[in-house]
């Protein structure tokens, strides 16, 4: 089966590359199949974006914003349809994908506000003229989308980039082609001019062709650290290309004494297991204080975790989690659990595959407190490592003992401890008595170290979608009353 899965220069076309197939995570039924875009089609997409750039970037910003607002309105009309598409190909429950669509809709207004506040135009009056600050789009930008939020996360790059006046080539994850296709159809319906947004579907070869294309002025990426590092190496020695990397994390959640144990456990579960552990901000390491209170927290956490039953995305009543993205992801997580056990980790709740040929996994908790060298890896799924500590200094040292730096958090009634954490944590997101997976659309989103390259997204996405232009201007040119030393203008 091959059909028109790529949108280039305002036309839907068939791919000329290798065949790609999307399987249902739940039962491995074929959901989607097409040929990927080959290198020549990627070049055509980049050329179409370049051809469309001048007209799009020279439109008044108000006209570009009208298209974005129309897209948001169409999203609202089609929100249930798109939520079901996302659920189908990710296996996330409908309750969660519905919230993803709402985030996509809200991104329009918040991005317009951020563009005005962070990259709009300003003027300062000076004694002999004016100082102007304006912002200009980069040009043609490549957007690489992840599979865990196939609607919301690419949308968080696409909308700010379009508002700024850029044109785009979008390469989604090959694991979520349907969401990308349906989203681009809404952009087309919204009246986005031909060539402004182009879609190329495919796997590694398609992505490599896009990264290597000389027409690309910038790359916006959300995904794994390994892939992000690969992108960084490929673009090494090309400082003229803007690169924004939002990668993963080996995030630590510190639990201090807290009277309401159930509230603490609820926050832990929301931090570690929501989206089947497939959020980049999910807690990977749980740090619990030694003592009777910590023991009680762990006992209750085990009880609650054992009762989490993954199920089909449209099951009634709705499950807390569905499956992970693929059978390969299942295998990777089971192997990770096995490696940790061989290192001396003790499984308190075993991560298990619910049935063959399904990606439904029961969440796992493994105590690695006695493991000498815990691997500094992001296990992207419902596998939580438990570590015990005695003092807050020790907990802080453990939390910071990672090459990543995306998120960390604290469950504690003690504001002074949070103050210390916020001063000393090496992370871009630091939460207190809130899930690690919670974030504000009015704040930047990103990390340091192996979690990113200091190009946070969300409210700060406007920053990497445009470059500043500073100007000194005067309406008239006059000879100054006092000349520079050594200059003479004879009568």
Curated annotation (Swiss-Prot):
Protein family according to the UniProt entry: Belongs to the aldehyde dehydrogenase family. AstD subfamily.
GO terms of molecular function: succinylglutamate-semialdehyde dehydrogenase activity
Catalytic activity: N-succinyl-L-glutamate 5-semialdehyde + NAD(+) + H2O = N-succinyl-L-glutamate + NADH + 2 H(+)
Record's function text: Catalyzes the NAD-dependent reduction of succinylglutamate semialdehyde into succinylglutamate.
PANTHER family per UniProt: SUCCINATE-SEMIALDEHYDE DEHYDROGENASE, MITOCHONDRIAL (PTHR43353:SF5)
Pathway given in the UniProt record: Amino-acid degradation; L-arginine degradation via AST pathway; L-glutamate and succinate from L-arginine: step 4/5
Enzyme Commission identifier(s): 1.2.1.71
Residues annotated for NAD(+) binding in this entry: 223-228
GO biological process, one term: arginine catabolic process to glutamate
Active site feature: 246, 280
InterPro entries registered for this protein in UniProt: Ald_DH/histidinol_DH, Ald_DH_C, Ald_DH_CS_CYS, Ald_DH_CS_GLU, Ald_DH_N, Aldehyde_DH_dom, Aldehyde_DH_Superfamily, SuccinylGlu_semiald_DH_AstD
Coiled coil: none
Source species, domain of life: Bacteria
Name of the protein in question: N-succinylglutamate 5-semialdehyde dehydrogenase
Keyword Oxidoreductase part of the UniProt annotation: yes
UniProt cross-references to NCBIfam families, sorted A to Z: arg_catab_astD, PRK09457.1
Keyword tags: Arginine metabolism, NAD, Oxidoreductase
């Amino acid at each position: 089966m091959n059909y028109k899965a790529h949108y280039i220069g305002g036309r839907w076309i068939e791919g000329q590359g290798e065949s790609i197939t999307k399987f249902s995570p739940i039962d491995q039924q074929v959901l989607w199949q097409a040929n990927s875009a080959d290198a020549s089609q990627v070049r055509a997409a980049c050329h179409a974006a370049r051809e469309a750039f001048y007209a799009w970037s020279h439109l008044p910003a108000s006209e570009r914003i009208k298209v974005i607002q129309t897209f948001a309105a169409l999203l609202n009309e089609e929100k249930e349809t798109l939520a079901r598409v996302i659920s189908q190909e990710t296996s996330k429950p409908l309750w969660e994908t519905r919230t993803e669509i709402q985030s996509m809709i809200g991104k329009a207004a918040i991005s317009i506000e951020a563009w005005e506040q962070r990259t709009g135009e300003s003027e300062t009056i000076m004694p002999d003229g004016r100082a102007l600050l304006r912002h200009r789009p980069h040009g043609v930008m490549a957007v690489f989308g992840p599979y865990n939020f196939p609607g919301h996360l690419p949308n968080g790059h696409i909308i700010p980039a379009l508002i700024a006046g850029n044109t785009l080539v979008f390469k989604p994850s090959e694991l979520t082609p349907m969401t990308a296709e349906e989203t681009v159809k809404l952009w087309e319906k919204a009246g986005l001019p031909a060539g402004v947004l182009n879609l190329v579907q495919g796997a590694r070869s398609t992505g490599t062709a896009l990264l290597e294309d000389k027409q690309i002025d910038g790359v916006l990426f959300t995904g794994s650290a390994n892939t992000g590092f690969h992108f960084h190496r490929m673009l090494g020695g090309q400082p003229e290309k803007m690169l924004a990397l939002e990668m993963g994390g080996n995030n630590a959640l510190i639990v201090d004494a807290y009277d309401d144990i159930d509230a603490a456990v609820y926050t832990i579960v929301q931090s570690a297991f929501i989206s089947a552990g497939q959020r980049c901000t999910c807690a990977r390491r749980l740090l619990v204080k030694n003592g009777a209170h910590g023991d009680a927290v762990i006992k209750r956490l085990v009880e609650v975790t054992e009762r989490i039953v993954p199920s089909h995305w449209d099951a009634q009543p709705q499950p807390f989690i569905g499956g992970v993205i693929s059978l390969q992801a299942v295998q990777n997580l089971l192997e990770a659990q096995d490696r940790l056990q061989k290192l001396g980790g003790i499984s308190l709740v075993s991560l298990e595959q619910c049935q063959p040929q399904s990606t439904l996994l029961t969440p796992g908790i493994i105590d690695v407190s006695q493991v000498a060298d815990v691997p500094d890896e992001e296990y992207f799924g419902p596998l939580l490592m438990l570590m015990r500590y005695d003092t807050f200094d020790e907990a802080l040292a453990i939390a910071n003992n990672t090459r990543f730096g995306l998120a960390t958090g604290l469950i504690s009634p003690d504001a002074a401890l949070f103050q210390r954490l916020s001063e000393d944590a090496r992370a871009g997101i630091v939460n207190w008595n809130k899930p690690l997976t919670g974030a504000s659309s009015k704040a930047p989103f990103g990390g340091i170290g192996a979690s990113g390259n200091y190009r946070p997204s969300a409210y700060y996405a406007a920053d990497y979608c445009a470059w500043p232009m500073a100007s000194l201007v005067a309406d008239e040119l006059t000879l100054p009353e006092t000349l520079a030393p050594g200059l003479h203008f004879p009568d």
